[in-house]
């Protein structure tokens, strides 16, 4: 048989928290295989010392145990000890969780090592409906524990998961804090199921539930010494059914309560039936009246709870187990979102919050606001004036641009027309020059010499027949290209006579130009 190494033994002891002898024996059984030895230890455990039981949750592993340690270590007197020391926390008796209706059924513990019966290590019965826990010998019910080993769940041993913490002890306080998360989840689930007649859902957030649980746990921690000496049990009518569909069963917190129940003539034991429990949950020692107030119950039970002396620490169940501050915040949030909320929806009159009166502003603040408004108005006016000026300047520039374009077009048209006129005049002059009659010779008796003085001072002369028309003289003056046609008239100085376009068809002899030589000048019209 292989001898395990000291490193493997130390590792096994660190992981499992067992003794050196157990570590050596397990490692020798599995030939030094540390993984198989640890798995076998957590799977089978020490069967000679503990009752095997199929438990879903199992013992919290090392890391989980360290994680769920008391969050307030300064209050824990066992904080300096190791997690694996043989302290009361690691040697507490097992407990069994069962529903409310199962609490009326006797529960027996069957163990292969001995006959069933109650002992100091008897399983602690926990009510999953959050009623008070029955500890150790105080539990009158018997539980049949089905010894089925869970081979699949090898991460945690089952033999070390059944321990009970005495009420009022330091370990009980640590257990309270370890169960905060479970209480928060339960409170949130129970609150989410509650609805009003108008389908208005009142839900409890995880943060609010945590605050309330911490508040209640703080009160419990401060009064733990008083609870250790004096236990208060609330009798519950047997056979009554709560609003959540479970039977409300009596629960005892001490031996005195059990004795009282035995002496009570009205107490009737239910038919004993064996109960096989496969789903134990972690025990929560101490009173759970704060959480019982959050559970839905019958109207009579709610009225009795609300008017009972011990109901001052709980919150109304119709509000989902939330505090009055959170209830008021929810009402204000709903009023802000939906513009108001009617009191008839919940049947509870809500306190009207006084609106804060608006005080008039101070004179200096009013003057500053007035000055600022005037400055803003002046600034806006200057911006408007600048905008108007810019718009006028833009319009002027646009008009000037359009006018320049039109002027250019007009000049271009005028130049084109002038060119056309010149071209037309040139064609006319060419035609007139072609139609001008032939000049007679110098010795012709019927010929007449005409001298015309132009406006520029030059003189032009030519011989014509006396039978030629006056139009021939106008054509001769036009082809000289000094003045434009139809812009002048001929004048004879003595006797003065002017000849115009109306006499162009008359001959020279008819208009009185009969001398051999005549002098004429042009007069512009």
Curated annotation (Swiss-Prot):
Residue spans of biased composition, Basic and acidic residues class: 209-229, 408-430
Superkingdom: Eukaryota
Coiled-coil region list: 380-436
Region entry Disordered, spans: 67-96, 150-172, 194-328, 408-446
Residue numbers bearing the Phosphoserine modification: 362
Entry keyword Hydrolase: no
Keywords, in A-Z order: Coiled coil, Phosphoprotein, Ubl conjugation pathway
InterPro entries referenced in this protein's UniProt entry, alphabetically: UBA-like_sf, Ubiquitin-like_domsf, UBX_dom, UBX_domain-protein
Start-end of Acidic residues biased regions: 254-274
All copies of domain UBX, residue ranges: 443-521
Domain UBA-like: 2-44
PANTHER family (alphabetical): FAS-ASSOCIATED PROTEIN (PTHR23322), UBX DOMAIN-CONTAINING PROTEIN 8 (PTHR23322:SF93)
Protein name: Plant UBX domain-containing protein 13
Gene encoding the protein: PUX13
């Amino acid at each position: 048989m292989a001898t395990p190494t000291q490193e493997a033994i130390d590792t096994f002891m660190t992981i499992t928290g067992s003794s050196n002898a157990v570590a050596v024996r397990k490692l020798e059984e599995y030939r030094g295989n540390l993984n198989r030895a640890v798995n076998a230890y957590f799977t089978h455990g020490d069967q000679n010392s503990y009752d095997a039981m199929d438990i879903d949750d199992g013992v919290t592993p090392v890391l989980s145990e360290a994680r769920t340690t008391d969050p307030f270590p300064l209050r824990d007197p066992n904080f300096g000890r190791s997690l694996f020391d043989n302290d009361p926390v690691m040697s507490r008796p097992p407990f069994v969780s069962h529903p409310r209706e199962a609490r009326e059924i006797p529960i027996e513990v069957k163990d292969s090592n001995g006959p069933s019966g109650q002992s100091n290590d008897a399983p602690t019965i926990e009510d999953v409906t959050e009623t008070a826990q029955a500890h150790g010998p105080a539990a009158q019910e018997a539980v049949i524990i089905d010894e089925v080993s869970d081979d699949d769940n090898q991460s945690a041993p089952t033999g070390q998961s059944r321990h009970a913490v005495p009420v009022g002890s330091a370990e009980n306080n640590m257990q309270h804090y370890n169960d905060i998360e479970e209480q928060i989840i339960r409170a949130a689930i129970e609150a989410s199921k509650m609805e009003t007649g108008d389908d208005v859902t009142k839900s409890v957030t995880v943060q609010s539930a945590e605050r309330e649980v911490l508040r209640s746990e703080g009160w419990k921690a401060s009064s733990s010494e008083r609870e250790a000496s004096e236990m208060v049990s609330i009798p519950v009518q047997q056979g009554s059914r709560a609003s959540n569909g479970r039977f409300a069963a009596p629960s005892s917190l001490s031996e005195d309560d059990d004795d009282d129940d035995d002496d009570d003539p009205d107490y009737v034991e239910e038919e004993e039936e064996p109960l096989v429990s496969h789903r134990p949950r972690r025990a929560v020692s101490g009173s759970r009246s704060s959480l019982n107030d959050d559970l839905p119950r019958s109207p009579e039970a709610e009225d009795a709870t609300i008017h009972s002396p011990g109901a001052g620490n709980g919150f109304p169940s119709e509000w989902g187990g939330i505090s009055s501050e959170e209830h008021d915040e929810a009402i204000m949030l709903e009023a802000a979102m939906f513009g108001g909320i009617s009191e008839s929806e919940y049947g509870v009159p809500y306190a009207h919050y006084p609106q804060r009166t608006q005080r008039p502003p101070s004179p200096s603040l009013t003057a500053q606001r007035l000055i600022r408004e005037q400055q803003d108005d002046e600034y806006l006016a200057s911006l408007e004036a600048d905008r108007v000026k810019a718009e006028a300047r833009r319009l002027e520039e646009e008009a000037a641009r359009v006018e320049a374009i039109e002027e250019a077009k007009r000049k271009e048209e005028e130049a084109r027309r002038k060119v056309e006129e010149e071209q037309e005049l040139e064609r006319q002059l060419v035609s007139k020059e072609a139609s001008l009659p032939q000049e007679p010779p110098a010795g012709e008796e019927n010929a007449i010499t005409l001298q015309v003085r132009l406006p520029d001072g030059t003189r032009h002369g030519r011989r014509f027949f006396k039978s030629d028309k006056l139009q021939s003289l106008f054509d001769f003056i036009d082809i000289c290209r000094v003045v434009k046609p139809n812009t002048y008239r001929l004048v004879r100085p003595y006797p003065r006579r002017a000849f115009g376009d109306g006499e162009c068809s008359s001959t020279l002899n008819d208009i009185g130009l009969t001398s051999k030589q005549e002098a004429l000048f042009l007069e512009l019209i």
